[in-house]
């Protein structure tokens, strides 16, 4: 939800600018993570009545969302990048790789060609690939 604001600010200024978003799926209705609802069918609600601060887990952005965000931010010239509260090492790796860096954590990037069901590696059993198409 902050990308339109970052673009607007970037167009208005010429100095250095930072982007350090939270790694959670905020919305226009809930622009911060302090009052994000859990609409994922959770039947065991947090004792304090909201997801913040201890029940945000199902609201995380995934690696692909993070990469797309930081690729876009990098394109518009914002160079001081990072992730704020709740970031995982995977989120930080996506920031680095989105701007073309290879970091020590890059060696842990998924290798989908070796996935037991969705892989394209010659060792991937055909019956498992077929199962994945219908799973």
Q: Where do the model's predicted regions map?
A:
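Domain-level signal for soluble alpha/beta catalytic cores
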Residues: 1-135
């Amino acid at each position: 939800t902050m990308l339109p604001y970052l673009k607007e600010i970037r167009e208005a200024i010429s100095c250095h600018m930072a982007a350090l978003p939270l790694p959670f799926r905020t919305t226009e209705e809930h622009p911060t993570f302090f009052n994000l609802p859990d609409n994922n069918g959770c039947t065991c609600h947090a004792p304090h009545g909201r997801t913040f601060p201890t029940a945000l887990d199902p609201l995380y952005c995934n690696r692909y969302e993070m990469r797309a965000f930081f690729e876009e931010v990098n394109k518009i010239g914002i160079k001081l990048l990072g992730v704020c509260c709740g970031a995982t090492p995977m989120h930080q790796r996506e920031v680095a790789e989105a701007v073309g860096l290879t970091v020590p954590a890059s060696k842990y990037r998924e290798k989908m060609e070796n996935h037991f069901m969705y892989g394209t590696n010659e060792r991937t059993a055909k019956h498992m690939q077929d199962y994945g198409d219908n799973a």
